[in-house]
């Protein structure tokens, strides 16, 4: 990694930690430059503005996450033998992998901040850049659940997404036991969540 790319990555990592801790409004550029060990000119050079920096923090994680989701969905989409659990696995497993991958857990706190702070510009950014992912999953859910109205399906998908976000946060009642590996615990979480979500989506 060259010096410029290394500086940009360092700024993104510091910003992610600060946004998780202080929120988007609470984290100042002065705090960011101190945490990243750079000057303000470097932040402006790589990102131009704080808003652009916030967006790049999201893109760094979500571009990869959603590429994995869509690749998994492509493997099962439209096939007559595809089950609801197959589509849910494509949606859930990459997200759980992210939450346990390096700084992914920290990013989940940033994502939670985004929803909690009701930032309209950030919501628009997420919708504009990643809304197509949810639309593709929703279309496949609708194919498998033709008995549901569009409104009812949206309600259920929204609640499934909430359950996934909770599972990714790591703050649930079920914590990993000391004799269970991280990989095994993640697989247990995925299996339980997929079964739970499938039951909720397909309920009468």
Regions found by a protein language model. Give the residues of each.
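An amphipathic alpha-helix adjacent to DNA-recognition modules
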Residues: 8-13, 47-70, 74-77, 81, ...
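Helix-turn-helix
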Residues: 10, 18-52, 56
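Short, amphipathic alpha-helical "lid/cap" segments that border enzyme active or binding sites
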Residues: 12, 66, 85-92, 157, ...
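Hydrophobic alpha-helical connector segments
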Residues: 71-105
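Amphipathic alpha-helical segments used for helix-helix packing
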Residues: 86-88, 99-128, 172-173
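Short alpha-helical scaffolding segments that buttress acidic/His motifs in well-ordered protein cores
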Residues: 91, 95, 108-115, 160, ...
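C-terminal peripheral helix-coil segments that are non-catalytic and often amphipathic
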Residues: 98, 128-204
């Amino acid at each position: 990694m060259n010096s410029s790319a290394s500086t940009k990555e360092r700024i993104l990592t510091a910003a992610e930690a600060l946004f998780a801790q202080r929120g988007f409004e609470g984290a100042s550029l002065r705090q960011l430059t101190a945490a990243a060990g750079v000057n303000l000119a470097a932040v402006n050079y790589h990102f131009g503005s704080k808003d652009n920096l916030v967006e790049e923090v999201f893109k760094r994680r979500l571009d990869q996450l959603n590429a994995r989701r869509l690749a998994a969905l492509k493997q099962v989409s439209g096939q007559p033998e595809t089950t609801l659990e197959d589509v849910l696995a494509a949606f859930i497993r990459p997200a759980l992998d992210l939450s346990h991958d390096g700084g992914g857990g920290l990013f989940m706190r940033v994502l939670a901040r985004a929803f909690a702070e009701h930032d309209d510009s950030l919501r628009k950014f997420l919708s504009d850049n990643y809304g197509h992912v949810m639309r593709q999953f929703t279309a496949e859910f609708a194919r498998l659940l033709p008995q549901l109205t569009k409104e009812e399906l949206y309600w259920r998908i929204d609640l499934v997404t909430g359950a996934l976000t909770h599972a990714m946060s790591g703050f649930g009642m079920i914590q990993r036991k000391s004799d269970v590996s991280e990989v095994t615990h993640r697989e247990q979480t995925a299996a339980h969540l997929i079964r739970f979500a499938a039951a909720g989506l397909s309920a009468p």
